[in-house]
């Protein structure tokens, strides 16, 4: 007797359902894709008991004839393709012919449809894949599919479904992804007979604001690029909107939602140092690509794709996003960090929170450029005048030379002498008492008046950004600027510290350190980089080694980038250091001459803006 037999169709369908129908959201996805392929201009979804009791979708597409309806629940029956060659030029979302057969085999399935020219609709009911009723019904053109009691005959699968909140969250995310991809379609969603949304217009901003928060769309950076190989359009978020989850990162290929590690990594790399640990940027990106360049027949769920030339796509997407991101003014408005953290905490505690309209006003005001913010700052400054004789000591002359021409010419990245910033003179005039429109707050923050309100700068991370970019430039160009010590310093290192020292020794020399090994784990410091303060040589070197090790453990950084971050962090002026007016002006000018003045090398914000509009609201003027 043969031991290998062909499985019955009902068993094969249940096995197939295990791949295609993993949870109620899988049913929603498959039915929505069929409705879109049918040319629907309106889609209505009704969900009950998180899809366990009911998933119903009504569309006004072209409908089906009764013979087609009987065939559509058979395995590998489809109207989308008729040959393998058509997979290369596929223009529809569905094509495998498995979904309806799989869904009907594990549910009480009802299909009602009416196509153009039919006198009446027909109704077919299935239980566990078996046809139990055929009848006539009244209906407009289109198709209605109802899936009840999902997994009623597969109790093991039903047992592993999550809570209603979790399952409905997956359903909502599925509908959200499709509603954003097809703004020309009217969408309506009901959950347990409660209407959650009804999009009647094709306004993308309306949908973005609903799904992500009021005025959210105004805070996005629009991307629109096209070449002979691909088109890329959509939106990415400003760093003030960054979150620690990837739910708000949506990628599409030819309007098909996909999951792709390469695209996610390209996005992360495009933001680079704007991100702190575990942050992810918002993205809604649509890639248009020749269908022959991508294989979507990788997995039954059709979320994974395989590119013919993945490296080429990455090399095109990365610079487009990077260029768009770096041109923006990323200084967040006051209060945003707290609002986002509070919203993230609420979302983590209750997944349904993300389904409601968020009640924050603006994550990071409408996009503007770095130049706009700097010009706004400069326009509010009084004319530069010479300081009163003797008022700021000898260091003032250095700052006067540095600052005088800065408002009449384009600034280029350069570095001021750090020793000047660190010099303290109690005889200097207090900036708060002058008419400079620049003040130091608690010896931590620099407050500047700008056209739209106030700009607050964290002096430590601002200086850190300046030193970081200077360090990177010096190491890359191999033009160290070393100061020789009159009395060399000797430092004893631990074993692990000495190993790291040996690893980064060449780049320390590029940076301006003149170092010599002196016996077992002993290092002689004979010269230091320009920005190291006299008397702190040994401490700074040891702190840099410690910081380098911490960065290496937590972050995946290239060696020079790690060293530059360690150097800038340990050498920057500290919170609590009193600065003169000229020192603050110099720091601001040097900051805005950097590539990215809005975040420090570790991703912390450098600048916060407080608009007049916000102040007026706080005081009840608006």
Curated annotation (Swiss-Prot):
Spell out the molecular function terms from Gene Ontology: ATP binding; ATP hydrolysis activity; ATP-dependent DNA damage sensor activity; mismatched DNA binding
Name of a matching Pfam family: DNA_mis_repair
Looking up InterPro entries in the UniProt record yields: DNA_mismatch_repair_CS (IPR014762), DNA_mismatch_repair_MutL (IPR020667), DNA_mismatch_S5_2-like (IPR013507), HATPase_C_sf (IPR036890), MutL/Mlh/PMS (IPR002099), MutL/Mlh/Pms-like (IPR038973), MutL_C (IPR014790), MutL_C_dimsub (IPR042120)
Protein's GO biological process: mismatch repair
Q: Which domain of life is it from?
A: Bacteria
Keyword match Glycosyltransferase: no
Q: Which UniProt keywords apply?
A: DNA damage, DNA repair
Instruction: Name the SUPFAM superfamilies on file.
Output: ATPase domain of HSP90 chaperone/DNA topoisomerase II/histidine kinase, DNA mismatch repair protein MutL, Ribosomal protein S5 domain 2-like
The answer, when asked if Secreted is one of the entry's keywords, is no
Q: Give the family this protein belongs to, as stated in its UniProt record.
A: Belongs to the DNA mismatch repair MutL/HexB family.
Cross-referenced PANTHER family, in alphabetical order? DNA MISMATCH REPAIR PROTEIN MLH, PMS, MUTL, DNA MISMATCH REPAIR PROTEIN MLH1
Cited function: This protein is involved in the repair of mismatches in DNA. It is required for dam-dependent methyl-directed DNA mismatch repair. May act as a 'molecular matchmaker', a protein that promotes the formation of a stable complex between two or more DNA-binding proteins in an ATP-dependent manner without itself being part of a final effector complex.
> What is this protein called in UniProt?
DNA mismatch repair protein MutL
Q: What is the lineage of its organism?
A: Bacteria, Pseudomonadati, Chlorobiota, Chlorobiia, Chlorobiales
Gene encoding this polypeptide?
mutL
């Amino acid at each position: 007797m043969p031991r290998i037999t062909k499985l019955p169709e009902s068993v094969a369908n249940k096995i197939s359902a295990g791949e295609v129908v993993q949870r109620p959201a899988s049913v929603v996805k498959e039915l929505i894709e069929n409705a879109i392929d049918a040319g629907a201009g309106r889609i209505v979804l009704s969900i009950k008991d998180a899809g366990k009791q009911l998933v119903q979708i009504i569309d006004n597409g072209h409908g089906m004839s009764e013979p087609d309806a009987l065939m559509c629940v058979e395995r590998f029956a489809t109207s989308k393709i008729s040959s393998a060659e058509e997979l290369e030029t596929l223009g529809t979302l569905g094509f495998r012919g498995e979904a309806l057969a799989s869904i009907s085999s594990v549910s009480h399935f009802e299909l009602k449809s009416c196509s153009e020219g039919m006198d009446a609709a027909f109704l077919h009911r299935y239980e566990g894949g078996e046809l139990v009723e055929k009848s006539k019904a009244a209906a407009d053109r289109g198709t209605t599919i109802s899936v009840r009691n999902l997994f009623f005959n597969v109790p093991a699968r039903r047992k592993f479904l999550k809570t209603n909140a979790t399952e409905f969250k997956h359903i909502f995310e599925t509908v959200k992804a499709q509603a954003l991809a097809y703004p020309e379609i009217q969408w309506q969603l009901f959950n347990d007979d409660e209407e959650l949304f009804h999009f009647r217009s094709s306004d993308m901003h309306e949908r973005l604001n609903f799904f992500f928060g009021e005025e959210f769309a105004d805070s996005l950076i629009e991307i629109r690029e096209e070449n002979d190989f691909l088109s890329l359009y959509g939106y990415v978020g400003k760093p003030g909107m960054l979150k620690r989850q990837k739910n708000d990162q949506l990628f599409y290929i030819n309007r098909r939602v996909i999951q792709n590690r390469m695209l996610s990594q390209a996005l992360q790399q495009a933001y680079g140092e704007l991100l702190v640990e575990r942050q992810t940027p918002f993205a809604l990106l649509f890639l248009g690509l020749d269908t022959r360049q991508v294989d979507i027949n990788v997995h039954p769920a059709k979320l994974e794709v395989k590119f013919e030339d993945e490296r080429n796509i990455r090399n095109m997407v990365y610079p487009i996003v990077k260029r768009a991101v770096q041109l923006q003014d990323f200084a967040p408005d006051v209060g945003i960090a707290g609002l986002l953290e509070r919203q993230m905490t609420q979302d983590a505690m209750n997944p349904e929170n993300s389904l409601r309209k968020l009640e924050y006003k603006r994550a990071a005001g409408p996009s503007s450029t770095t130049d706009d913010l700097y010009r706004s700052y400069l326009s509010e400054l009084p004319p530069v005048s010479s300081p009163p004789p003797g008022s700021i000591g000898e260091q003032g002359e250095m700052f006067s030379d540095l600052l005088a021409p800065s408002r009449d010419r384009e600034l280029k990245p350069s570095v001021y002498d750090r020793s000047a910033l660190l010099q303290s003179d109690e005889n200097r005039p207090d900036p708060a008492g002058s008419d400079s429109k620049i003040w130091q707050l608690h010896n931590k923050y620099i407050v500047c008046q700008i056209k739209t309100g106030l700009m607050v700068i964290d002096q430590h991370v601002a200086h850190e950004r300046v030193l970081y970019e200077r360090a990177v430039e010096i190491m890359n160009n191999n033009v160290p600027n070393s100061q020789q010590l009159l009395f060399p310093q000797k430092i004893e290192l631990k074993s692990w510290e000495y190993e790291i020292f040996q690893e980064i020794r060449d780049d320390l020399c590029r940076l301006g350190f003149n170092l010599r090994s002196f016996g077992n784990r002993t290092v002689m410091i004979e010269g230091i980089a320009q920005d190291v303060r006299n008397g702190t040589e040994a401490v700074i070197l040891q702190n840099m080694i410690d910081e380098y090790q911490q960065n290496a453990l937590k972050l995946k950084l290239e060696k020079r980038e790690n060293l530059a971050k360690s150097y800038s962090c340990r050498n920057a002026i500290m919170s609590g250091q009193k600065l003169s007016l000229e020192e603050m002006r110099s720091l601001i000018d040097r900051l805005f001459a950097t590539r990215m003045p809005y975040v420090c090398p570790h991703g912390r914000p450098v600048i916060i803006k407080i608009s007049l509009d916000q102040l007026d609201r706080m005081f009840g003027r608006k």
